[in-house]
């Protein structure tokens, strides 16, 4: 059985907060940290919208959630490294609040729900910090911009504010079964939503109609939060990588690019599909789709523990160059085109990024100042560890803003046939994105959303 394939059974257990805390503590100790120290984290505060009394949308701090599994706002936690004791502090009952919101979770209920050793109320935080047995001779680890003014670390010998954040970011890369199960569930729900959009596409009159279809399918499956703002781009709008207007009329455009994914218990899915709105590709759009699908198949098949992501990104460019040469859009020697980075005009972004609690998850070590334009926007660099989850999202785009400077450059334009290119502007862009778990000897694709040509066209035409 694949890892966490039985995700519903896995999710009957508790989020592994203590295992995460121990892993973070081990990282700190391995870097020379205090084995008798205490880790301290705060949840996000519930805030009001500016200039009114309505609550702003709440998003839990991921650093706090990773060591607690708790989505309650205004909470705190401590983890005592030597004793491996994890304590959660949640807001106490406030009678005025009960009138409006009902009774909050009690410490007893929290102890039952979360993977913690004890639960106190937020009134006890400072007293607990001062009473920790080893505090006078030990170190408190915290994230400086995430410590409330009323919190005091006065009883600790050392205050360390640099190690905790990178420790958590590093540990988040390698996923537990529970985390993989959450990502699988998010992918299952998002797949149902993508399929609903495909079925509704042929009669849609506006991009926003299809965005609404996606959101409805997620919410009715109790996935009320999106991992990011959906991209619903018809025709040439798909040439804009992060097009988010989602409000243009749909008339004679051939393709729709849908980049959308829901979130389940703070874990993201990130899926892109491009398909013909009426169920039939044009000659040009089909040719580009086949290139991108080939790019993705080859890159996914290259994945396993230890593979260098930069090299897989290069592979995507080489497959794109081969395909664009066959179509006549590019001309000349494939190796020269690769070396001179001409393919970046058509594939300007990175092949993918780590996925987890954030859509662009931590630990990727990107270099946005890289002088090599092929790698500047590659959000993950270096080798991929086992149990990391990476998005594989190759694309080919016809963006005038990006391509036209190449056509004005005497050295670069000789590799592009403008007369052939002219036929492809209306394609806009094609991107196909899956969420892939890296295993010791290969991979597991967590995204079951249809993408093969026959599968998507049959689905669209079935309505």
UniProtKB/Swiss-Prot annotation:
A Pfam family per the record: AMP_N
Residue positions binding Mn(2+) 1: 270, 393, 433
Keyword Metal-binding: yes
Cofactor: how bound: Binds 2 manganese ions per subunit.
Enzyme class, first EC level, given as a word: hydrolase
Domain of life (superkingdom): Eukaryota
InterPro entries assigned: Aminopep_P_N, Creatin/AminoP/Spt16_N, Creatinase/aminopeptidase-like, Pept_M24, X-Pro_dipept-like
GO BP field: proteolysis
Molecular function as annotated in GO: manganese ion binding; metalloaminopeptidase activity
Keyword Membrane: no
Annotated CDD domains: Prolidase (cd01087)
Descriptive protein name: Probable Xaa-Pro aminopeptidase pepP
Organism: Pyrenophora tritici-repentis (strain Pt-1C-BFP)
């Amino acid at each position: 059985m694949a890892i966490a394939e039985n995700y519903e059974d896995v999710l009957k257990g508790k989020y592994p907060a203590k295992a995460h805390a121990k892993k973070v503590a081990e990282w700190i100790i391995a870097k020379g940290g205090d084995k008798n120290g205490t880790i301290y984290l705060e949840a996000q505060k519930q805030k009001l919208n500016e200039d009114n009394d309505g609550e702003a949308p709440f998003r839990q701090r991921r650093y706090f959630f990773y060591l607690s599994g708790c989505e309650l706002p205004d909470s705190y936690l401590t983890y005592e490294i030597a004793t491996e004791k994890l304590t959660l502090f949640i807001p106490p009952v406030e009678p005025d609040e009960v009138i409006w919101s009902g009774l909050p979770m009690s410490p007893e209920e929290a102890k039952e729900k979360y993977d913690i050793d004890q639960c106190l109320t937020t009134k006890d935080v400072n007293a607990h910090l001062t009473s920790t047995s080893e505090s006078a001779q030990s170190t408190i680890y915290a994230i400086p911009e995430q410590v409330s003014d009323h919190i005091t670390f006065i009883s600790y010998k050392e205050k360390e504010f640099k190690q905790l954040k990178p420790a958590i970011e590093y540990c988040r890369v390698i996923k537990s079964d529970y985390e993989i199960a959450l990502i699988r569930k998010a992918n299952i729900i998002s797949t149902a939503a993508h399929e609903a959009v495909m079925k509704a596409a042929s009669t849609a009159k506006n991009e926003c109609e299809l965005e609404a279809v996606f959101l409805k399918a997620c919410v009715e499956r109790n996935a009320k939060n999106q991992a990011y703002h959906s991209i619903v781009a018809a025709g040439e709008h798909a040439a804009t990588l992060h097009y988010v207007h989602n409000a243009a009329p749909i008339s004679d455009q051939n393709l729709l690019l849908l980049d959308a994914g829901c979130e389940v218990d703070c874990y993201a899915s990130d899926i892109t599909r491009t398909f013909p709105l009426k169920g039939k590709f044009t000659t040009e759009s089909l040719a580009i789709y086949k290139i991108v699908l080939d790019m993705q198949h080859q890159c996914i098949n290259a994945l396993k523990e230890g593979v260098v992501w930069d090299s897989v990104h290069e592979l995507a460019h080489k497959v794109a160059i081969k395909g664009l040469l066959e179509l006549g859009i590019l001309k000349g020697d494939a190796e020269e085109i690769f070396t001179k980075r001409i393919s970046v005009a058509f594939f300007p972004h990175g092949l993918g990024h780590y996925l987890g609690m954030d859509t662009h998850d931590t630990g990727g070590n990107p270099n946005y100042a890289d002088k090599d334009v092929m790698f500047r926007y590659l959000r993950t660099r270096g080798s991929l560890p086992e149990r990391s989850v990476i998005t594989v999202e190759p694309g080919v785009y016809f963006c005038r803003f990006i391509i036209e400077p190449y056509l004005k450059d005497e050295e670069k334009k000789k590799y592009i046939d403008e007369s052939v290119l002219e036929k492809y502007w209306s394609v806009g862009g094609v991107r196909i994105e899956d969420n892939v778990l890296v295993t010791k000897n290969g991979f597991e694709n967590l995204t079951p959303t249809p993408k093969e040509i026959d599968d998507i066209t049959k689905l669209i035409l079935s309505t």
